[in-house]
Amino acid sequence: MAQAGRTGYDNREIVMKYIHYKLSQRGYEWDAGDADAAPLGAAPTPGIFSFQPESNPMPAVHRDMAARTSPLRPLVATAGPALSPVPPVVHLTLRRAGDDFSRRYRRDFAEMSSQLHLTPFTARGRFATVVEELFRDGVNWGRIVAFFEFGGVMCVESVNREMSPLVDNIALWMTEYLNRHLHTWIQDNGGWDAFVELYGPSMRPLFDFSWLSLKTLLSLALVGACITLGAYLGHK
């Protein structure tokens, strides 16, 4: 596989294609085409997601509120070094790892979805609370996969609740967090190429916490309890 160099791959492309995949698993279509419809590295354009079946669009005031009511700062697109195109094997390996994660905890994820209580006013706060707990004790590949899968759950739940414009925001928040908080760790640990080598066809186990209920951990995180979810989410 071609090495991406120090700058790495485009996190936005990875996020967009992962979300597209998770939504397609539930029968939601993305009519805007490929994730590269907007320039690489740019913030997602409002309204680029379109779903079937069609639902009533969220009022503009709610879309704005979803972006403003959050402890996370908005992502500002800045010029930087050119990022390498993401090899298909990276997307494929991440999808397989996410599917493995969701299969192991299918019932827990289903129950967690019902507990999210997503609204345009609470979505970003929910995202921030869970992600901060997830990485409280540091970063590893298992936690990164859990991060992607949680983002996918939020996107699916948003569409299920007829709040599909939230998907644009969730994609932005995921990209923002990857760029600001996870990118350096990923590059220092061999980049996404290392992830593929470690967890590709052989699928080295990422998740070794079957004795602990994911539902319990994520439910506690959702209400802001000070637990360390990340400590149980795999190993480097």
UniProtKB/Swiss-Prot annotation:
PTM per Swiss-Prot/TrEMBL: Phosphorylation/dephosphorylation on Ser-70 regulates anti-apoptotic activity. Growth factor-stimulated phosphorylation on Ser-70 by PKC is required for the anti-apoptosis activity and occurs during the G2/M phase of the cell cycle. In the absence of growth factors, BCL2 appears to be phosphorylated by other protein kinases such as ERKs and stress-activated kinases. Phosphorylated by MAPK8/JNK1 at Thr-69, Ser-70 and Ser-84, which stimulates starvation-induced autophagy. Dephosphorylated by protein phosphatase 2A (PP2A). Proteolytically cleaved by caspases during apoptosis. The cleaved protein, lacking the BH4 motif, has pro-apoptotic activity, causes the release of cytochrome c into the cytosol promoting further caspase activity.
Q: Where is this motif: BH1?
A: 133-152
Per UniProt, the short sequence motif BH3 occupies residue numbers: 90-104
The subcellular location is:
Mitochondrion outer membrane; Nucleus membrane; Endoplasmic reticulum membrane; Cytoplasm
> What residues bear Phosphoserine in this entry?
S70, S84
- Indicate what this protein is called per its UniProt record: Apoptosis regulator Bcl-2
Query: Which key words are in the record?
Result: Apoptosis, Autophagy, Cytoplasm, Endoplasmic reticulum, Membrane, Mitochondrion, Mitochondrion outer membrane, Nucleus, Phosphoprotein, Transmembrane, Transmembrane helix, Ubl conjugation
Report the gene knockout effect. Answer: In response to intraperitoneal injection of muramyl dipeptide (MDP), knockout animals show lower serum IL1B levels than wild type. Mutant macrophages release 30% less IL1B than the wild-type cells.
Does Transmembrane helix appear among the keywords? yes
The protein's organism comes out as Mus musculus
**Chief place where the protein resides:** mitochondrion
GO CC annotations, alphabetized: BAD-BCL-2 complex; cytoplasm; cytosol; endoplasmic reticulum; endoplasmic reticulum membrane; membrane; mitochondrial membrane; mitochondrial outer membrane
User: What taxonomic ancestry is recorded?
Assistant: Eukaryota, Metazoa, Chordata, Craniata, Vertebrata
